[in-house]
């Protein structure tokens, strides 16, 4: 949801753009832009996309504790299918879809957009299935413009995800550094992701395009602890614990 807020903020600065926010929940900040609907409600989507020129598809089931796991596929794949059908019914031919680097799987060293998909969990597999659906769609809809964005872990205003929890642990002093701290964490700031989506809308108007998004450099855990302490002017303990001890929690 923080992505939606930042994208709306960014797009409202672009001349000659009128926004419609379609969401399952009413927006506290943008109620005047919001229409309530679910990507699983194809009929409602067809109704709301009348007169629309471009769709940014952010809707996704993404939390780690989703049950049943079939919800990943219901929302992420069937939701994509409903969106495409609603777009086609209304003559909408431009789509920006936020996928994920999760399609590459674990422990890949800076994979390019051409790297083979190797998702390791249901979230990643469902995102890849949604991309495959888009590829098949584009094969028979060559006049469309489809831009796929694969961001890494996103952090920023309004976010209470993994990066937020990590930084909160570091700030609290309860963070235990397991190993030598040289493992790296790739991240993307939500404001930068929103700006890149705006760039795609304004500049990538033809063809089928795929983009990874990561804000470089990747920080080591040692870097993160240092920078958090530096920003807060606070000493953060940096005792390192061996991996075998960390395995016991």
Provide a role label for each language-model segment.
Residues 2-7:
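Short, small-residue-biased leader/transition segments that mark boundaries at the very start
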Residues 73-80, 96-99, 126-127, 186:
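Short alpha-helix in the Rossmann-fold core of NAD(P)-dependent oxidoreductases
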Residues 203-249:
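Mid/C-terminal beta-alpha module of Rossmann-like enzyme folds, strongest
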Residues 82-123, 140:
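Conserved Rossmann-fold NAD(P)-dependent oxidoreductase catalytic core, especially the SDR/UDP-sugar
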Residues 39-78, 82, 86, 104:
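NAD(P)H-binding glycine-rich loop region in Rossmannoid oxidoreductase-like domains
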Residues 104-105, 144-165:
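Flexible, glycine-rich beta-alpha linker
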Residues 120-147:
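Active-site Tyr-X1-5-Lys
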Residues 159-165, 179-202, 208-212:
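Substrate-positioning beta->alpha
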């Amino acid at each position: 949801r923080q992505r939606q807020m930042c994208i709306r903020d960014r797009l409202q600065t672009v001349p000659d753009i009128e926004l419609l926010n379609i969401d399952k929940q009413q927006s506290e900040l943008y109620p005047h832009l919001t229409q309530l609907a679910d990507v699983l409600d194809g009929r409602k989507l067809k109704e709301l996309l009348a007169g629309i020129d471009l769709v940014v598809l952010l809707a996704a089931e993404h939390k780690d504790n989703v049950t049943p796991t079939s919800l990943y596929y219901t929302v992420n794949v069937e939701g994509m299918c409903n969106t495409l059908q609603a777009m086609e019914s209304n003559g909408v031919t431009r789509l920006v879809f936020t996928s994920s680097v999760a399609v590459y799987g674990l422990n890949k060293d800076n994979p390019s957009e051409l790297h083979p998909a190797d998702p390791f969990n249901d979230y990643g597999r469902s995102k890849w299935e949604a991309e495959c659906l888009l590829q098949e769609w584009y094969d028979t809809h060559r006049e469309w413009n489809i831009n796929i964005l694969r961001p890494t872990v996103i952090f920023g205003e309004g976010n209470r995800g993994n990066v937020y929890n990590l930084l909160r642990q570091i700030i609290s002093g309860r963070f235990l550094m397991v190993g030598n701290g040289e493992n790296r964490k790739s991240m993307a700031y939500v404001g930068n992701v929103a700006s890149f989506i705006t760039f795609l809308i304004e500049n990538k108007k033809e063809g089928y395009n795929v983009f990874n998004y990561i804000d470089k450099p990747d920080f080591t855990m040692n870097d993160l602890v240092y920078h958090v302490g530096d920003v807060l002017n606070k000493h953060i303990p940096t005792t390192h614990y061996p991996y075998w001890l960390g395995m016991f929690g």
